[in-house]
A protein has these predicted regions:
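DNA-dependent DNA polymerase catalytic subunits
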Residues: 1-239
């Protein structure tokens, strides 16, 4: 900092003198020192930072700019897993990342539906309600799940156990495998998954893992040519 900044300032002043500028206004300061970085697009990057504005770290910290891998709409366990995966990308190998992803997949499948579901806000529940078809055409997926939840809670007379989803409610939703007994691929709920409806065994853990964990990582891994799983090739076939 004490060497580079004065040198850069002298270069700017030399340039200003060369072009006969009225005043030298250009300033540059050191921001981060990192040993690794991944750029997915302009102004979208991850840095493995050891020094930030003169503050030196004992362990590197991730700096993310324009990267939406960790969002509030992502299930909480996946947010932690994604952060750890990003750290591993900065310090490990592709094989180590793939192994970590498989470990995460195994742990993910042991979690209850409440922990792997997507958090959302239920706006306009009544707007999309339809008497004959439960929900209207074009209903957002989490609202469709909310209307299905309300319908089957009432159908199974579970109103005393589960509160119906109202406008503005904080909810969660998850995908279901088809075919299933409600003939739908989604269900929403408030806090407790509606096990009494009989759809627990249809929770699509593979699709949930794909959308909440793998898809956010793929955008970053693609930028460095890494994969989320081991791929077979002719060379590996003969070894």
């Amino acid at each position: 900092e004490m060497e580079f900044e004065p040198y850069i300032e002298s270069c700017y002043q030399e340039l200003a003198d060369y072009v006969n500028a009225y005043d030298q206004k250009m300033v540059m300061a050191r921001e981060n020192i990192a040993d690794r970085g991944i750029w997915t697009a302009k102004k979208r990057y991850i840095l493995n930072v050891w020094d930030s504005e003169g503050v030196r770290y004992e362990e590197p910290k991730l700096k993310m700019m324009g990267i939406e891998a960790v969002k509030s709409s992502t299930p909480a366990p996946c947010r932690t897993m994604i952060k750890d995966a990003l750290k591993l990308m900065m310090s490990g190998t592709e094989d180590e990342v793939i192994s970590y992803i498989e470990d995460c997949r195994a742990k993910f499948k042991k979690l209850p539906p409440e922990e792997i579901s997507f958090p959302r806000s239920a706006t306009n529940v009544t707007k999309y309600s339809a008497h004959s078809t439960i929900y209207a055409k074009g209903t957002p997926i989490h609202i469709r799940g909310a209307l299905l939840f309300n319908h089957y809670v009432k159908k199974h007379k579970l109103d005393n156990k589960y509160s119906l989803i109202q406008n503005g409610e904080k909810i969660k939703f998850c995908y279901l495998k088809k075919p299933n007994i409600i003939h739908e691929n989604i269900i929403s709920f408030i806090q407790d998954f509606p096990h009494d409806i009989g759809i627990t065994k249809y929770v699509d853990y593979d699709l949930q893992f794909e959308k909440s964990f793998l898809e956010p990582l793929k955008a970053i891994l693609d930028a460095i040519g890494w994969s989320v799983e081991k791929t077979a090739n002719l060379e590996s076939f003969f070894t």
